[in-house]
Amino acid sequence: MEMLQGLLLWLLLNVGGVWASRGPLRPLCRPINATLAAENEACPVCVTFTTTICAGYCPSMVRVLPAILPPMPQPVCTYHELHFASIRLPGCPPGVDPMVSFPVALSCRCGPCRLSNSDCGGPRAQPLACDRPPLPGLLFL
């Protein structure tokens, strides 16, 4: 009887783990469209634009006994292939570079967070907050 209970518990945990990691409520790491903002302190406006970023769920594990073993690295959804695009901020005074470059995700992967091409800080309360008045309506993909 104990063996049957152990087998049932093992089955439930494994099936539940597979369901949770592949469930419809957790979209996997992939490129998605996002609206971002760009500004320069010397220019009079903030420009919003649409680009492709990496977002989604990456399977991860947490140690049961964290005090005994070091923490496991947690993968994040990050760029696999990308190219850079640029926009020009209007109204910048002479001598100020009006160009702002940004990454455009072509494909994504789960891996370690690299500060050289990713923001590893997590979600922001106001990702589009600008200090300058907005100039909406630009679309870049």
Curated annotation (Swiss-Prot):
PROSITE patterns: GLYCO_HORMONE_BETA_1, GLYCO_HORMONE_BETA_2. Disulfide bonds join C29-C77, C43-C92, C46-C130, C54-C108, C58-C110, C113-C120. One of its GO terms (biological process) is G protein-coupled receptor signaling pathway. Its main location: secreted. One of its GO terms (cellular component) is extracellular space. It holds the Pfam family Cys_knot. Residues 1-20 form the signal peptide. GO terms for molecular function: hormone activity. It is found in: Secreted. InterPro entries: Cystine-knot_cytokine (IPR029034), Glyco_hormone_CN (IPR006208), Gonadotropin_bsu (IPR001545), Gonadotropin_bsu_CS (IPR018245). Glycans are attached at N33. CDD domains: GHB_like. Keywords: Disulfide bond, Glycoprotein, Hormone, Secreted, Signal. Belongs to the glycoprotein hormones subunit beta family. Promotes spermatogenesis and ovulation by stimulating the testes and ovaries to synthesize steroids. Heterodimer of a common alpha chain and a unique beta chain which confers biological specificity to thyrotropin, lutropin, follitropin and gonadotropin. This is Lutropin subunit beta. It comes from Ailurus fulgens (Himalayan red panda).
